[in-house]
A protein has these predicted regions:
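Membrane-embedded alpha-helical segments that form the functional core of polytopic membrane enzymes
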Residues: 18-66, 79-101, 186-199
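Cytoplasmic-side transmembrane-helix entry/capping segments in multi-pass membrane proteins
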Residues: 67-70, 98-99, 124-130
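Helix-loop junctions at the membrane-solvent interface of multi-pass transporters
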Residues: 23-27, 85, 113, 143-144, ...
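C-terminal membrane-associated helical module and adjoining short loops/tails
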Residues: 2-6, 16-17, 35-44, 118-223
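Core segments of transmembrane alpha-helices
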Residues: 13-20, 71-80, 107-108, 130-142
Length: 223
């Protein structure tokens, strides 16, 4: 294996995956949210960059082809687990996350079972779109934590009556509470909608992979 830049970026993305969760054990919020968001977005961008550079410089390798989907899955799975811990077990979050995790385990199991025939389960364009939507959804949901915590910090010491008057426009909004609340709502519902879209694409691509694997699953084992 050659340590080309695309391979280095892939390894860095894999190494960054647990950092998204661990940072919440090291830093208080919202600083942890900021670092997790920056780390996740940077890692997601390397997913595009390493493939682009590998094609541009003709530096494709078996190592990169093997590690790239593993790094993607590690980033998504660890980030989703982190979000579940941050948001709690909300129905709107549990269902799409469960669908995404089930599909990832199912397809990985299919590939392992097929062995040298796993080449029939090549990554499709729709699967790439699925990964892109997943990563955008996760980034948006991490940003929700930032808006939520800045809002919470700014209302400390304010009575509910004052907060209500600010939202009613009766008192000057010096701390931008209305804007923070609006952006938090947009990030939350936007992230949830994108996550459900990703879950739908996840199911569709999972069924597609199963259909492609079925001819091999019907084969009788040879003695």
């Amino acid at each position: 294996m050659r340590w080309t830049l695309p391979n280095i970026l892939t390894v860095a993305r894999l190494a960054a995956a647990p950092g998204v969760a661990i940072i919440f054990l090291i830093l208080p919020r919202p600083y942890a949210d900021w670092v997790a968001l920056i780390l996740f977005v940077t890692a997601a961008l390397t997913d595009w960059l390493d493939g682009y550079l590998a094609r541009l410089w003709k530096q494709h390798s078996r190592f990169g082809a093997m590690l790239d989907p593993i790094a993607d899955k590690a980033m998504v799975v660890i980030a989703l687990a982190t979000l579940m811990g941050l948001f709690g077990f909300q129905t709107l979050l549990i269902l799409p996350v469960a669908a995404i995790l089930f599909r990832e385990v199912f397809v990985s199991g299919l590939r392992e079972f097929l062995g040298n025939k796993a080449g029939t389960l090549q990554v499709t364009k729709l699967a790439k779109w699925k990964t892109t939507v997943q990563m955008i959804a996760i980034a948006v949901l991490f940003s929700y934590g930032i808006f939520e915590h800045h809002f919470g910090m700014n209302v400390i010491g304010m009575s509910p009556e004052i907060v209500a008057q600010i939202f009613a426009g009766e008192v000057e909004d010096e701390f931008h509470l209305v804007a923070l609340s609006q952006w938090a709502n947009r990030a939350y519902f936007g992230g949830i909608i994108l996550l459900w879209l990703a879950a739908g694409l996840t199911v569709v691509t999972g069924v597609d992979y199963l259909a492609k694997a079925m001819p091999h699953l019907r084969e009788e084992p040879h003695d």
